Structure formats: structure tokens, C-alpha cells
Amino acid sequence: VPDYRLDKLNEMYNPKKLVPTTFEFTDIAGLVKGASKGEGLGNKFLSHIREVDAIVEVVRCFEDGEITHVEGKIDPIRDIEIINTELILADLEIVENRISKIEKKAETTKDKAAVLELTALRKSKEALESGKALRSVEYTEDELLCISGFNFITLKKIIYAANVNDEDAIAGSNEFTKLVQEYADKEGSKVIVMCAKLESELSDYEDEERKAFMEDLGLNASGLDQLIKATYDLLGLKTFFTSGEDECRAWTFKDGMKAPECAGIIHTDFQKGFIKAEIMSYEDLATLGSEKAVQEAGKLRLEGKEYIMKDGDICYFRFNVTK
């Protein structure tokens, strides 16, 4: 995950090791009509996609006579709806199968858990049958909890990556991406405009060369960097840092996590034996110039077990594990 703050910490500490935080994009083979019934790589594709945290749908938004579209012409909305329909049908099959198994129990025994699950599933079925993704459904917290184990695909958040030619990537849009944006706006999703061909070329350059090339093109950030940031935000992820002469490292945590949980990301012993966290903000360190200056300014804080971590916190965890 690109982060200018880690670059600044590298300048300040000159550590032996610099470790950015990461997350993984998995390239899953494309979907065809009938995938929900097992056609193409259908069942295999769907089993893979159920395990992910979020979905990035790459949508063709460029004309090129040398690259034939499987459907014959460029129509990004049609392509999106082919994919989304297959995902909806796949979820609907699971919902219907589960309803048939618990319906009788819920209605005869009035078991609270079964009744709650049946209510959530019927709500899901109604949405899916009307062509709506489950992420558009308003569930209660209890309903969401009881259906979380099904890994419904259409419950996952989505980003549309509009794949354009290099000229349109520099311009930021074209007639096709505008259609995708309108579609995404209706469901509250985000669109990233990028050129896969250009991104491939950029990946061949070293950092300084890449930066110079992008400046020549008038690009502030690569499409990949924009996609990474958008995905990070979509999943509610934040970054804290550990820094020193040996290593400066960025760590990913979920928004709302407390200090002991974040300590546990580094090592389970840190969480088990958590005592306190010494914390300074990146902004204070960057402004004041050194840890010593931060401390002298009274900006170095000792936080306890209930402290909710903030993006950009630089941490030293105090812990003690008795064997």
C-alpha cells in the first residue's frame, strides 16, 4: 500500500528495513452467462469469490478493433449486468435451499434463532428476485450476523475498475466511464478509471523513473495506487506505524480497533500481555522533526486498553507475558 508517511519515516530514521503494509488482489477468471449454473468456470469462480472481502469488477471501456469483445460490441453496462445477474442467481440458490431447510422449524417451534434467520433470508430472497444485490438491503445487526456465515457474494462491497485507453486514462473519463459512473452512483459504489496497458508499462519502471514518466503524462497517481486507496477505504482499513533504527513498518488495522487488538496484529503476546501504548501521531512527528521534540512538546502519550487507534499513530507497545 503506497504511503508517503512511511517514506518520510524512512528519511527520518534511516532504518535497516522498511516494510509497507499490504493486502492481496486475487485475479479470478472472468464470468460468463450461465456461471451460476456451472457453465464456464462457474462453480469454481463462485467458490473463490465467496472468500474475498470485497470485489473489483474490471469493465472494458475502450474501443479497439484488434481486441474482439466476446459479446461483439462495447457496452459496459451490459457487461456489468451479466456479471451481477450471475452473482445474484448464485446467492438466490443458496437462499432458497436454506429457506427450505429451516422454514418448517422456524414456523412450528418458534425457535428465536431460526425465526430470525428465516426473516433475514426471506428479506434476502425478495431483494434477489427483484434483481437487487444484498448490499442494497437494510438488515438489522442481528440479521447480518445470522447470515454472515453464508458468504453471500452480493453482500460484499464492490468497486468498478473502468479499463480505458491511455489517452482516456489521462483525461480521466470517456463516454463509457460516464455510463459506469451513473450505474455505480445508483448503488453507492465507486469507480476507478485506469488503463491496464499503461499500468503494465508503469510496473516495469523503477520508482524515480515511474514518477518522472507519470509527471510527463500529467498523472498525479497511477490507476493501481488509486485502486489500492479506494479498496483500503472501502474496507474501513487504517494504518499505524512502528518505527526505529532497525525497522520502520506500516500495519493495517480495522477502523475502531483498540490498542491491545492492534498490538496483537504484531504478535499475539503483545495483546495478551498488553500494559500500555506509547503513541505519537505522524503529523506531530513530521511537524516537530524528532521523537525528542515530540516528547518535549508533550505530544507523546501513554494510552491504555480502551484507547481506539487512529490512522497515522506511531506506536511502541509495552507488554509483559508471564509464563
Specify the residue positions occupied by each region the protein language model found.
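Switch II of P-loop NTPase G domains
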Residues: 4-57, 61-81, 140-150, 173-176
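Conserved nucleotide-binding/hydrolysis micro-motifs of P-loop NTPases
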Residues: 3-6, 30-32, 60-66, 73-75, ...
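Hydrophobic faces of stable alpha-helices that mediate helix-helix packing
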Residues: 25, 49, 92, 96-99, ...
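Switch/coupling subdomain of P-loop NTPase systems
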Residues: 54-57, 62-90, 94-97, 155, ...
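Residue-level signature of catalytic and energy-coupling elements of molecular machines
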Residues: 9, 27, 45, 56, ...
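Flexible beta-alpha connector loops of hexameric P-loop NTPases
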Residues: 31-37, 72-74, 81-87, 106-113, ...
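C-terminal-of-GTPase-core extension/linker across diverse P-loop GTPases
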Residues: 101-310, 315, 320-321
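Amphipathic, soluble alpha-helical interaction motifs
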Residues: 12, 55-58, 86, 98, ...
